[in-house]
């Protein structure tokens, strides 16, 4: 099994979108006639399942405030928050594709490794999770691409659980969506379950311990590596920019949904029903007892096609004389209402 890590010119890359683009690029373009292991850890990131509605999975206000990355992966499953307190063990398996869909076999090397490190109470639970004393410490996903299994799982050493709790609590109200919602589960951490000699390890050390256990080697230096070339990295950068750092992929792929907001503003009650498709406003209707002079249909039409982001909504509404349409109301208050 080859080891590939996000190391570029001697520097460890912690950009989660780059890590994902690297895996996809290798799966599509690099064939070594052996299985490949991609372990990585990254800056705070929410990874969205391929078929999920980003808008209802995350608290966008919290994401914006704390500069947390949102990336949609190519495999299914639920939304997950990871940071430098988690190791993500991804792989390409081509030697035995019968493992596809069999999460028990897929997880076996990880379970064995964790037991060796002292976390003997880690077990597989449900279809694709690992739990420790009833708390989730890992979730897995896989897909079949190019006749190879592409999949992986996270291992929660000790992530920021406050951030995880807040970022995965959507704040939009009254949404009726056709998207698949994540199943919320209590989560735990692995650090406290490790043997005492491992409990103060860094995330880098934990990653290396898992790799050596899975590869059956004594030292990470013994691993058989494939070093990504400059040409590889250029292609990875391009893929990340075009897809995994692209708003249309990460947000615009969300299913259609509708929601309603009604709020008492300074000029009266404003009631707005919005239909969102590809995370842009497809249609909206505005009602209320506010004192405006203009035809509110002008505002409804102006909002059509606008991205559901604070920046785009502010820009679009500032093109209008909001006081003319709503009375003593600010653009900021309308945007806050739409996004609340």
Swiss-Prot record:
InterPro entries: aa-tRNA-synth_II/BPL/LPL, BPL_LPL_catalytic, Lipoate_protein_ligase_C, LipoylTrfase_LipoateP_Ligase. Keywords: ATP-binding, Coiled coil, Ligase, Nucleotide-binding. Its EC number is 6.3.1.20. GO terms for biological process: protein lipoylation. Residues 293-321 form a coiled coil. The keyword Cell inner membrane does not apply. CDD domains: LplA (cd16443). Pfam families: Lip_prot_lig_C, LplA-B_cat. Residues 31-222 form the BPL/LPL catalytic domain. Gene3D superfamilies: Bira Bifunctional Protein, Domain 2, CO dehydrogenase flavoprotein, C-terminal domain. Pathway: Protein modification; protein lipoylation via exogenous pathway; protein N(6)-(lipoyl)lysine from lipoate: step 1/2; Protein modification; protein lipoylation via exogenous pathway; protein N(6)-(lipoyl)lysine from lipoate: step 2/2. One of its GO terms (cellular component) is cytoplasm. ATP binds at residues 73, 78-81, 136, 140. The keyword ATP-binding applies. Changing residue 129 to A: Reduces enzymatic activity. (R)-lipoate binds at residue 136. It catalyses: L-lysyl-[lipoyl-carrier protein] + (R)-lipoate + ATP = N(6)-[(R)-lipoyl]-L-lysyl-[lipoyl-carrier protein] + AMP + diphosphate + H(+). GO terms for molecular function: ATP binding; lipoate-protein ligase activity; lipoyltransferase activity. Belongs to the LplA family. Catalyzes specifically the lipoylation of GcvH-L (SAV0324), likely via the ATP-dependent activation of lipoate to lipoyl-AMP and the transfer of the activated lipoyl onto the lipoyl domain of the target protein. Can also utilize lipoamide as substrate for GcvH-L modification. This is Lipoate--protein ligase 2. It comes from Staphylococcus aureus (strain Mu50 / ATCC 700699).
